[in-house]
Amino acid sequence: MKPAERRKARHLALQAIYQWQLAKDNVADIVEQFKLEQPTKGVDLPYFELLLTGVVNNVTNLDATFSPFLSRKLDDLDQIDKGVLRLACYELTYCKDVPYKVVINEAIELAKAFATDDSHKFVNGVLDKVVKQMGLRQ
């Protein structure tokens, strides 16, 4: 799969995760809605579905992965930041074919595209600690 197709899948997945976080809609319904309403040309759709369902099905474990490194309570975290961290922690934990540096870079780019001005710095700092804790840094 081309990196650009995965990048687009991450963009869509973050938007879908955001929707799920706010509305708690059924994941299958969100997937269908996104396929109908979002431009999916050049998107790795199976990867999009994997990321969305993976985050939703593992949200408690993912939150436990990054929560110790937050400077505030999880409930006080911006929804986009929370979605980016959940998505990145899912990839770090379950998508072993994706190098951790790629995961962090993609998370930073998502934060720059969708979140507040300094969110990318916050996301980078948290994920740096997660990677260290997971023993992924060489």
Curated annotation (Swiss-Prot):
One of its GO terms (biological process) is transcription antitermination. One of its GO terms (molecular function) is RNA binding. Gene3D superfamilies: NusB-like (1.10.940.10). The keyword Cell wall biogenesis/degradation does not apply. It comes from the Bacteria. HAMAP family: NusB. This is Transcription antitermination protein NusB.
